[in-house]
Regions:
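N-terminal accessory segment detector
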Residues: 1-101, 115-180
Length: 180
């Protein structure tokens, strides 16, 4: 419904930014809840909460980080992703990943935890015809030019000059069928 109402790009940006904010909040909470454990034990609270909240299963493939040095590399395999399963139920297999909120969450979580902008990108996705979703995260600078499209989805629309006007949103909503 969000995609039909707002369009693919605006919906993606909205979901990604919502996920990012949720991730930053959960990272703050993980630091408090696991304050007496190792940094790695603190960090893995995020993927554990991902599962406990019913979002999907998150299996670490590789996780290396050093907060003091600002180094981070994370790679996770996601299965049974609710967000993705809903997407493929309503849209055909395509060329773009669709776990927008969860990638935003991973980026926000890692960024808050590391104190440095970390970008997770979905490099394989069920909505692209793969068997599972795979994400890779590292500092934005380490991605180079590859990061630009994904970073756009983390920025407020007004900063991109793409904020839809109220008239445009009203026009889109006017063509939707009324709920009975």
């Amino acid at each position: 419904e969000m995609i039909e109402t707002l369009g693919m790009d605006v919906a993606r940006r909205l979901f990604t930014r919502m996920g990012y904010q949720a991730g930053t909040y959960d990272a703050e909470m993980a630091r408090k809840v696991r304050s007496k454990t190792s940094l790695k034990d603190m960090f893995v609270v995020g993927p554990q909460m991902h599962c406990l909240e019913g979002i999907g299963l998150s299996e670490p493939i590789r996780l290396e980080f050093d907060v003091a040095k600002g180094e981070h590399y994370g790679e996770f395999l996601w299965t049974h992703q609710v967000e993705d399963e809903e997407h493929v139920r309503h849209f055909p297999i395509g060329t773009e990943p669709s776990c927008w909120m969860q990638v935003g969450y991973a980026s926000g979580y890692a960024t808050e935890f590391m104190g440095k902008q970390i970008l997770y990108r979905e490099v394989e996705c069920l909505s692209m015809g793969q068997e599972a979703c795979r994400i890779v995260g590292k500092p934005v600078d380490d991605w180079g030019d590859e990061a630009a499209p994904d970073l756009q989805h983390l920025m407020p629309p007004a900063l991109l000059g793409q904020a839809p006007s109220m008239a445009a949103l009203a026009a889109r909503a006017a063509v939707l069928p009324a709920e009975v």
